[in-house]
Amino acid sequence: MTLLDGKALSAKIKEELKEKNQFLKSKGIESCLAVILVGNNPASQTYVKSKAKACEECGIKSLVYHLNENTTQNELLALINTLNHDDSVHGILVQLPLPDHICKDLILESIISSKDVDGFHPINVGYLNLGLESGFLPCTPLGVMKLLKAYEIDLKGKDAVIIGASNIVGRPMATMLLNAGATVSVCHIKTKDLSLYTRQADLIIVAAGCVNLLRSDMVKEGVIVVDVGINRLESGKIVGDVDFEEVSKKSSYITPVPCGVGPMTIAMLLENTVKSAKNRLN
């Protein structure tokens, strides 16, 4: 069994991005990511701090806009519009979730696609579905693909099962795997017999937010397992969606939680931001 070490790979990517940023600075461009946080969700605050720290590590300027819980939808749209027209800002990220009185889809669609480094804008989703690399790809699925590529895992002809059908992970993940030549099945909470799919899979990607959803009796020998889930137990321990201790015994490759997919998600956000800055140079 080989661990798919996202922490080590993300560190390597950050070093490469640091060099690219030094080149951009020599051309008068400083990569810049604007992050908007609405309210005081503790988890969101932690995520925003980690993103700002990661930016600092590889030479990206970060601007954090922390708005209060009562910020109106129009006020948020006005800020995004200002950032859309600010040439010194190359990436805009709105930290989710948003308060109930704000329409998430409207907000995400208001970010100009050329600064949508999260890859959620309909234009970028369209590029992905057409198999084009013109836009920005969603960070978590992109991080998974980079991780598999780094370990020279050939996806052509692989039977892949994705558990979770969200617009953030499951759906774009399915499209990326299809584009890479895999045969893809997408399962979700209404799937009748999950094991029927997982036992035949060469690759399983779990992104459902459910502790121990994937167990040893549900996988075959030699399976490749990518655990996107992040769950906090009452003890405070962070675990994924996979029964790691048992499933790892049957796996050829598996991601740990933490230090698997999480660091890669942030690395891809940084990579997309630098890509946007480079596009400005071109």
From Swiss-Prot:
Which cysteines share a disulfide bond?
none
Record keyword Flavoprotein present: no
Enumerate the CDD domains for this protein. Answer: NAD_bind_m-THF_DH_Cyclohyd
- Which InterPro entries does UniProt cross-reference here? Aminoacid_DH-like_N_sf, NAD(P)-bd_dom_sf, THF_DH/CycHdrlase, THF_DH/CycHdrlase_cat_dom, THF_DH/CycHdrlase_CS, THF_DH/CycHdrlase_NAD-bd_dom
Key words, A-Z: Amino-acid biosynthesis, Histidine biosynthesis, Hydrolase, Methionine biosynthesis, Multifunctional enzyme, NADP, One-carbon metabolism, Oxidoreductase, Purine biosynthesis
Listed GO CC annotations: cytosol
Binding, NADP(+): 164-166, 189, 230
EC number(s) on file = 1.5.1.5, 3.5.4.9
SUPFAM superfamilies from the UniProt entry: Aminoacid dehydrogenase-like, N-terminal domain, NAD(P)-binding Rossmann-fold domains
What GO MF terms are annotated? Answer: methenyltetrahydrofolate cyclohydrolase activity; methylenetetrahydrofolate dehydrogenase (NADP+) activity
Q: Name one GO biological process term.
A: methionine biosynthetic process
Q: Which reaction does it catalyse?
A: (6R)-5,10-methylene-5,6,7,8-tetrahydrofolate + NADP(+) = (6R)-5,10-methenyltetrahydrofolate + NADPH; (6R)-5,10-methenyltetrahydrofolate + H2O = (6R)-10-formyltetrahydrofolate + H(+)
**Top-level division of the source organism's lineage:** Bacteria
- Report the pathway entry: One-carbon metabolism; tetrahydrofolate interconversion
Q: What does this protein do?
A: Catalyzes the oxidation of 5,10-methylenetetrahydrofolate to 5,10-methenyltetrahydrofolate and then the hydrolysis of 5,10-methenyltetrahydrofolate to 10-formyltetrahydrofolate.
- Give the record's subunit note: Homodimer.
Enumerate the PANTHER family for this protein. C-1-TETRAHYDROFOLATE SYNTHASE, CYTOPLASMIC (PTHR48099:SF5), C-1-TETRAHYDROFOLATE SYNTHASE, CYTOPLASMIC-RELATED (PTHR48099)
Q: Which HAMAP family match?
A: THF_DHG_CYH
Q: Which family does it belong to?
A: Belongs to the tetrahydrofolate dehydrogenase/cyclohydrolase family.
The name on file for this protein is Bifunctional protein FolD
- What species is this protein from? Campylobacter jejuni subsp. doylei (strain ATCC BAA-1458 / RM4099 / 269.97)
